[in-house]
């Protein structure tokens, strides 16, 4: 489910704030986001802004056409043709988009890391810890039933984004899906703590390229390698479960929902094409 909505999540900010305005002022938005964690110097902002402009040009010319191609494929999918295998193919393609973007920005992450002072590193780690604590607070003291309720609300919201209001049979599947999921909230809390430690070690090695780059590569491209055996097992189970239930829900789509999906895909395609102009 997570990778199926990668494209939607990555573009949601653009739509909410005015697509072209955000895209053509992306450097400002990225800097503003980073400064939620650490204040940058004027020189750091200038360098980062220049790099983001270059990346945006690459993204517009090289990547957006690939997104449009995938949306065209999605528009051809019907409830009758949807299968777990087809779903998986779309996931793999979306993940490839994400990895290409990571590969493009990796040198700039290294460049920015080298410019950080020791105090900025400390501030960044504290900001990361604050964010992780907010996640932990959302689940503090919740029962398993309440957590499954959160899962249900999240699943329902994301599915309805693409299909519109669900039918009773689909709502029942969503309930079964959420109730069947293995709870990972506390495993993610532990994982976040480990990642925070890894990021701190990474940044403390920012002047040692031979140590920094392999660790950065692992964090960017192999985050699953930091999963505990228990979390890895739960994630694999929940992913397979999500694929199965989502396909069943799609297969039950009526004409209204099919049209809703087609409209969503068409809207995203228009957004992407507009960004290229």
What is each model feature region?
Residues 22-70, 74:
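Start-of-domain marker
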Residues 34, 48, 102-116, 124, ...:
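Short, structured motif recognition centered on aromatic/hydrophobic residues
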Residues 14-16:
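C-terminal motif of bacterial Sec signal peptides marking the signal peptidase cleavage site
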Residues 18-20:
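Bacterial signal peptide processing site
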Residues 196, 200-277:
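A cross-kingdom marker for long, charged
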Residues 65-103:
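Mid-chain, structured segments of secreted extracytoplasmic proteins
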């Amino acid at each position: 489910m997570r990778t199926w909505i990668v494209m939607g999540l990555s573009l949601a900010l653009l739509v909410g704030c005015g697509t072209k305005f955000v895209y053509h002022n992306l450097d400002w938005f990225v800097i503003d986001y980073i400064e939620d964690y650490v204040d940058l110097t004027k020189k750091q902002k200038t360098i980062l802004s220049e790099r983001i402009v270059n990346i945006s040009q690459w993204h517009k010319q090289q990547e957006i056409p690939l997104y449009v191609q995938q949306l065209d494929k999605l528009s051809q999918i019907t409830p009758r043709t949807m299968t777990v295998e087809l779903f998986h193919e779309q996931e793999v393609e979306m993940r490839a988009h994400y990895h290409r973007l990571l590969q493009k920005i990796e040198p700039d992450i290294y460049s920015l890391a080298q410019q950080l002072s020791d105090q900025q590193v400390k501030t960044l780690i504290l900001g990361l810890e604050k964010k992780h604590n907010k996640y932990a607070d959302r689940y503090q003291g919740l029962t398993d039933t309440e957590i499954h309720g959160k899962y249900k609300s999240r699943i329902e919201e994301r599915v309805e984004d693409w299909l519109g209001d669900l039918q009773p049979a689909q709502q029942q599947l969503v309930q079964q899906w959420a109730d069947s999921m293995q709870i990972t909230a506390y495993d993610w809390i532990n994982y976040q703590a480990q990642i925070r430690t890894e990021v701190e070690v990474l940044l403390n090695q920012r002047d040692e390229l031979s140590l920094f780059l392999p660790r950065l590569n692992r964090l960017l491209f192999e985050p699953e390698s930091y999963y505990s055996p228990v979390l890895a097992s739960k994630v694999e189970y929940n992913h397979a479960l999500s694929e199965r239930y989502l396909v069943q829900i799609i297969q039950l789509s009526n004409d209204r929902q099919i049209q809703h999906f087609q409209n969503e895909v068409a809207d995203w395609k228009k957004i992407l094409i507009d960004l290229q102009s």
